[in-house]
């Protein structure tokens, strides 16, 4: 339908002289404004990426990244054989519009600006693509799939997911050793039951680390042995000093909450400990999909599949509400895992088949590519705002993931800063919450930026500045 083909280059070039930044970001911004203003009309077809790149004098990558970002934001829709069309966004909320008022916390403070870790940008959930995957799954489901589900998860999802983990994360993933769970926490809990069945009494964990992990261990009847984390990750050599410990839970890709990436030397040391002790490494592949300043690091499991159980989920990539997770276990551990499954705990079969379709179609890959662009830009904006408002604070752990660690100046009280920030409508996390024992002389806050709107970064940091100033005593 040639009459609907837009002369996109002339439309967007008018605005490319606006604010700077990478060219693909400028192009995305210009096209977004052209769609909002009506210069790019709903239903019009954008030119092929190769042609637009030629007209703009840029690489094709610039255009494809801009198209992917606009699709993720809901401004355009791409259909095989039909090209990329502008959607009708009149009357629709966009992701840069203010969020609805959030519910009040237990303390009565209304959270307006969410800088707490834990959530991805749920407003950017690829709803249309997910609905398409659900329809595809429902239309093709076999009668046999409507009976009692396989406790390990649907075979087709396990097959597709095994291929994805091998391709993207470098895992040695066999569908026979892959179990679908209700999330990473569910997977870890299942493995903890296996460890208890095998006579384990304690598990080594990262310190500082995810505080709910201790609850999972306690529920399974296991103790937690804290192993310190430094700027290279878990201090794996200290495991040799705990003879009773034969299992450890680690997050090498992006440790929470410190944000560090485990060094190659520590990875090798950890694998050596597993070989020497006959121990099991439980690898939580946390935040692995979001690495901004260098190439992603493959999973530890790919180098030590006989001693590593790999855990993953879509909590940070899509939404925690989906309740989809998985684990890949060593072949000799798999029968024990199956024996420990009291009842299927994974998502419903239709949801499993929908996620398989979502993976197989490439929607998941495209969603992650667009998300990485958004999160990288937001991280840079947040780091810049902190440098401008809080030059006495130091940022670490920002190379990957959706959170960073902000070390407060001498004399600051992190607990007071978090309380004052919450009273001002900004939710943050005190690092001491994730420590086994508080360390008052090393105050720090954990800042998450996954679900914070781009337009909210500056006001959030401005309010946080006042909170930290109010919580800092001067000599």
Can you name each region flagged by the protein language model?
Residues 117, 161, 326-328, 353-361:
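Helix-loop "lid/cap" segments that line or gate small-molecule binding pockets
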Residues 118-120, 252-256, 316, 452:
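Short glycine-rich anion-binding loops that position phosphate/pyrophosphate groups of nucleotides
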Residues 134, 143-277, 289-303, 307-309, ...:
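Conserved core of the PLP fold type I
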Residues 302-336, 347-350:
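Active-site PLP attachment segment
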